[in-house]
């Protein structure tokens, strides 16, 4: 491999890690401040100017906390589980396109990790792989509450992943490609797929909230029932990895939603990466708004909603899309 190509890969990897860590830190701060506003109180405002050094204080606190391993735990899998979760989340974000290719010092620079013909499929595979970390973490802890949290995670993943996939297939049919770059380019003239696939967008976002274990679908870690769910026995840096993976998954799934339905990085006047950041921020605000507004569902209702409401709606939307695309193709 040429040295320039290797250097490009290293720089891209370092940039992705920097973006992920920075976005996580200030997304967490933004969430705490927003929820404070929703509840008519102040959020973090003591550490640094207006509280903007609070993420740094949280990191220092977690670094110095004891990293305990339960006596009955499988030590190898217990340590490996958070690494699987964070690696899958960071790997997935590298597939989201941030902008059109540009030229720098005579070389083409792409604003994405890899433009694969099946990048959407690979991204879903990586996202699903991250849940094995949650399942392994709960099982390896040797704790009944952790195991129940893992079982709930597996059931919730199976229940909502199908509906999310079906909602994405409608976009793939309309764009005629599984490449995220091609899907963005198909919406470049402001024919955003949220306008032609509104039902698919709603299904995708509901499933996205469930896939990231966010309220009101945060049953795998319901503190009133399971202490803390799959990460009950985790502390210190291992706990922070699970925490980081959850928020990175929120960013990834918001990036995918913006790419599939809101035109991704396309838009007039502003740089592509800034357009994508604006759209992702809007979708992240929806995550936080739902957390501050809606109560947690009962577990049986969560399952019934996934199988008896969301999946039939996603299937009907896909069938209608297939008919419309087929008729348009014949013409």
PLM-predicted stretches and their roles:
Residues 1-331:
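Selective transmembrane helix interface/packing segments
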